[in-house]
Amino acid sequence: VLTIEKRGGAVMIGERREAILGMIIDYYINTGEPLGSKTLCSMLPYSISSATIRNEMALLTNMGFLEQRHTSGGRVPTKAAYRYYVDNIISSGALTEYEMMKLDEALSINASDPERLLASASELLSEVTGCAAFFSTLKDPYDCIQGIELIPAGNNKAMLVMLSLGGKIKSSVCNIACPIDDEFKSLFYKVTKEHFIGMPLSEIDLSFIQSTAPLFGAAIFDMLPILSTLCSLCQEAANGTLSISGETKLLSQSELGGSVYNLLALLAQKDKLEALLSQFARAKTGSVLMLGDENPVYELRNTAMAIQKFKYNNNQTATLGIIGSLRIDYKSILPRVDYIMKTVNQYLSEGGIRYE
């Protein structure tokens, strides 16, 4: 699951410089302020001269890990520094038993419904990280109808539920002009069992509905609202899904600056993000943490973006992840993201609802 891939070939900078770089990044993440040599000298757990600190900071600057935005100010980390920090300095933190219990409780509610599980996991990720979160499902041309349920709801209404082989559950209320008695339901289930169950979702369209009309005989006019609703549910399930949670949380991440508006526009339009996630879903990599310019999408090049891929129910593929500024609290956030991803993966591996 979200095991951060260590980037091979990175230049190791030595224990003392790692300690200095780590403290500068921690300070910047916590305060948003640059750190000067005098303050850093007082924070180190061992004695070292201010001149030595300045020399080490200058070397880290020359190596591309620090930058000085103002002549008289301290140093702040570069995008390359965050990558080195994640790969070589921080270690995976452990969640408390209480934290794990609360996350388990939140995810277990929708454990048997893959799409609702992914949606609740996305909302939970946004809540516990303070970032935007997302989930997506790929369009699967082989997904087909596994079950259909017609539930009378009174007042000439009925709830229609469609379950696909890939675990997608879609439902809608439709208006019926006649009572839904045993004869009505018997005819509906007979025709749908013989002609709809096992059909690819993408093939359930209006022309298919029209081709089945004679099978319903005189009842076709009463059946049409249900069949039209079923057609809509199948088309909805046949398409891929991209849902985003907590976009407005990005407005409070000051490190994004003016780029946040381009980022929000990207999330609203979805096209570029859908393309990126679709490309990732088809790649061999199971998880990735893209920092800064590692992201191929221009609007995401000031962000940290974690993505996890899931395979479930044979042909189904989904992604789940977060988007935040580069100044997120990696020590706190990554263990939570990792735990949620592992839990979701466990539930999906166990299999979703099956229609009997």
Task: Pin down the residues of each PLM region.
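Short amphipathic alpha-helical interface segments
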Residues: 20-31
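Short, Lys/Arg-enriched N-terminal segments with co-localized hydrophobic residues
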Residues: 1-11
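Short, leucine-enriched amphipathic alpha-helices that occur as contiguous helical runs
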Residues: 13, 17-21
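Intrinsically disordered, acidic Ser/Thr/Pro-rich low-complexity regulatory segments
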Residues: 90, 94-356
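Alpha-helical hairpin
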Residues: 12-13, 48, 77, 95
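Residue-level marker of regulatory loop/turn positions in helix-turn-helix DNA-binding domains and
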Residues: 13, 32-33, 252
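N-terminal helix-turn-helix
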Residues: 30, 35-89
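Charged, low-complexity terminal tails
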Residues: 8-9, 27, 41
